[in-house]
């Protein structure tokens, strides 16, 4: 399926290698790695660099995974490194609080991206209020946007706009969307919002991160996300260096240096990667079943420990419509599957 990009405009590009990529990196970034990545991104012309635990400010915990380096140290290091790019952080209400947001502002963030489930925009009101009170650029994330129709998401986006969001994102957290899904959802937000810009955040579980991003741009998306080498949860995100090349070929380059990004992906990010995310057996299952992308490594680890196929765990989580914050379901489902298997063998 082709999309008409004739009315699309060069997007604002946000890199989230140091946030979404933290999932793939098991939250083990060092200050030195953060500085090297930030410098390369800054020199290549990205608008903003998102830095925090993969699950946002305050996410370092037993449930979500402990950070090797305090996220405030990483934020401070990135802010000291960049010359042009803004520094952003993610915040999930219920995980991050005013305390973490205030500390992040003191460490140097200029933007906060406030993420809720796509059905729960109403819980973000006070967080947008705090962001504006602290002088931050405020962005809303409607996570797991594949789970609801465009018109429903438009209503949720209007709530965030009313709370003060400067941008509201359609977020394909499960990498479950087809291009027409991305197009329809972005289009609905563009028609519904009077002031706020519209963004799109892709995951590559079905191999469609770049394609869906182009569909979003065809629908009028103003902002898009990417990561170096696609380093992120599940099968990763839209690879920034690939996106830059595609945007340049389409006449939509917002000022990114394609060759600096290619070098950054190869020579800066390459040696840092724990592994190269791609649509493997379990990642495709996440996109197919519509499961939150960050569940992938947890399911692989628990499956290995208990001798349960991660694919079975992920498919069952999809059937139960598990969402972010329900990581404890992974162990529960795995134990239930193991018990069921043992019962079948006993019979």
Curated annotation (Swiss-Prot):
Appears to be allosterically activated by NADH. Has a half-life of 42 hours at 50 degrees Celsius. When TTHB246 is in complex with TTHB247, its half-life is reduced by approximately 30 hours. Its cofactor is Co(2+); Ni(2+); Mn(2+). One of its GO terms (biological process) is L-leucine biosynthetic process. The active site is at 23 (proton acceptor). Substrate binds at residues 19-20, 173, 201, 292. Divalent metal cation. Has the highest activity with Co(2+) as cofactor, followed by Ni(2+) and Mn(2+). Mg(2+) and Ca(2+) are very poor metal cofactors. Its EC number is 4.1.3.39, 4.1.3.43. Mn(2+) binds at residues 20, 201, 203. Residues 11-262 form the Pyruvate carboxyltransferase domain. InterPro entries: 2-IPM_HCS-like, 4OH_2_O-val_aldolase, Aldolase_TIM, DmpG_comm, DRE_TIM_HOA, PYR_CT. GO terms for molecular function: 2-isopropylmalate synthase activity; 4-hydroxy-2-oxovalerate aldolase activity; manganese ion binding. The keyword ATP-binding does not apply. The record marks 19 as: Transition state stabilizer. It is an enzyme of class 4 (lyase). It comes from the Bacteria. Homodimer. Can also form a heterotetramer composed of two aldolase (TTHB246) and two dehydrogenase (TTHB247) subunits. Upon complex formation, the aldolase shows a 5-fold increase in substrate affinity, while the dehydrogenase shows a 3-fold decrease; the kcat values of each enzyme are reduced by 2-fold when they are in a complex. Catalyzes the retro-aldol cleavage of both 4-hydroxy-2-oxopentanoate (HOPA) and 4-hydroxy-2-oxohexanoate (HOHA) to pyruvate and acetaldehyde or propanaldehyde, respectively. The aldehydes produced by this reaction are directly channeled to the dehydrogenase TTHB247, ensuring that these toxic aldehydes are sequestered from cellular components. Is involved in the meta-cleavage pathway for the degradation of aromatic compounds. Appears to be stereospecific since it can cleave (4S)-4-hydroxy-2-oxopentanoate but not the (4R) isomer. Belongs to the 4-hydroxy-2-oxovalerate aldolase family. This is 4-hydroxy-2-oxovalerate aldolase. The lineage of its organism: Bacteria, Thermotogati, Deinococcota, Deinococci, Thermales.
């Amino acid at each position: 399926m082709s999309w008409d990009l004739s009315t699309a405009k060069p997007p604002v590009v946000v890199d989230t290698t140091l946030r979404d990529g933290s999932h793939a990196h098991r939250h083990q970034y060092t200050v030195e790695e953060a500085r090297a990545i930030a410098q390369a991104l800054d020199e290549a012309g990205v608008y903003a660099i998102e830095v925090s635990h993969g699950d946002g400010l305050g996410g370092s915990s037993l449930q979500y995974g402990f950070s090797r380096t305090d996220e405030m140290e990483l934020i401070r290091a990135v802010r000291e490194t960049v010359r042009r790019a803004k520094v952003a952080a993610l915040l999930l209400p219920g995980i991050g609080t005013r305390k973490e947001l205030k500390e992040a502002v003191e460490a140097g963030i200029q933007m906060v991206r406030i993420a809720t489930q796509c059905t729960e925009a109403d819980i973000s009101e006070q967080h947008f209020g705090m962001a504006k009170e602290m002088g931050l650029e405020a962005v809303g994330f409607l996570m797991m946007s594949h789970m609801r129709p465009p018109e429903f998401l438009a209503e949720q986006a209007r709530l965030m706009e009313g709370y003060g969001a400067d941008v509201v994102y359609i977020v394909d957290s499960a990498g479950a969307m087809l291009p027409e899904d991305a197009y329809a959802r972005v289009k609905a937000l563009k028609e519904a919002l009077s002031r706020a810009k519209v963004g799109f955040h892709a995951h590559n579980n079905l191999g469609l991160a770049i394609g869906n991003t182009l569909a979003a741009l065809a629908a009028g998306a103003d902002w898009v996300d990417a990561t170096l080498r696609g380093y992120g949860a599940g099968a990763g995100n839209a690879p920034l260096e690939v996106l830059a090349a595609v945007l340049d070929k389409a006449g939509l380059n917002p000022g990114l240096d394609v060759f600096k990004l290619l070098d950054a992906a190869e020579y800066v990010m390459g040696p840092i990667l724990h592994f190269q995310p791609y649509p493997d057996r379990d990642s495709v299952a996440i996109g197919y079943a519509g499961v939150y992308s960050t569940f992938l490594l947890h399911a692989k680890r628990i499956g290995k420990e208990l001798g349960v196929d991660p694919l079975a765990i992920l498919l069952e989580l999809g059937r139960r419509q598990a969402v972010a914050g329900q990581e404890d379901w992974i162990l529960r489902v795995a134990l239930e599957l193991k018990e069921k298997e043992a019962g079948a063998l006993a019979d």
